[in-house]
A protein has these predicted regions:
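C-terminal region of N-terminal signal peptides and the immediate post-cleavage residues
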Residues: 24-40
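N-terminal export and membrane-targeting signals
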Residues: 1-18
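Primary mode marks residue(s) on the alpha4-beta5-alpha5 output face of response regulator receiver
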Residues: 35-64, 72-181
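Bacterial N-terminal signal peptides
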Residues: 16-26
Length: 181
């Protein structure tokens, strides 16, 4: 079993969504309607992507935000999510943060440059690429947006050191690349 499939199985088990583990991983194709879907999303000005970039993919994420108790307080540890389009797993999201294409192995790491709060959910984010690997879907990504977030907030209250909690969340992730010159 491939490492990507093992990861999909682990995330699906964590979410209790066994059907995700059965998703086929054939040739990737970003749907032509992705940009149209994105136009319907209200994006706060603070997390808008700078001019000179074009959206190359809009994917729906289902996963967990994992927190760990350290010195009696909850702190963020890592995300684990499967990003899909029309029910087909295309990208894995994990600690770094990093996003990796399950089809071509390309990846992007990024750092947060802006945040917009969301009631009862993790914030919406604008992240700038800090590195890319390999040609393919994510090989030239310059910016990533996390939009339409639900859930994923840190646990509250007292905790025992070393304890972890994985909190389900969903979001839309928009991937952007520089406009060709």
């Amino acid at each position: 079993m491939s490492e990507n499939m093992k990861r999909i199985n682990r995330i699906a088990a964590t979410l209790g969504v066994a059907a995700l583990a059965a998703v086929g991983l054939g040739a990737a194709a970003v749907p032509a309607g992705a940009a149209q879907v994105a136009s319907a999303v209200r994006v706060p000005d603070v997390i808008k992507v700078p001019a000179g970039n074009r959206q190359i993919a809009l994917l729906q994420a289902r996963g967990v935000q994992t927190y760990q108790c350290t010195s009696g307080a909850w702190g963020f540890l890592q995300p684990d999510a499967i990003l899909s389009s029309y029910g087909r797993a295309l990208v894995l999201h994990s600690r770094g943060p990093v996003w990796t294409s399950v089809d071509d192995g390309s990846s992007v790491t990024a750092a947060t440059v802006a945040s917009s709060p969301v009631p009862l959910a993790v914030p919406q984010l604008l992240l700038k690429s800090t590195g890319n690997r390999g040609p393919g879907l994510l090989g030239e990504v310059t910016f990533v947006q996390r939009l339409n977030t639900t859930g994923g907030l840190s646990p509250t209250g007292a905790c025992k050191d070393g304890t972890t909690a994985s909190i389900p969340y969903t979001a839309d992730y928009a991937f952007w690349a520089a406009v060709p010159k």
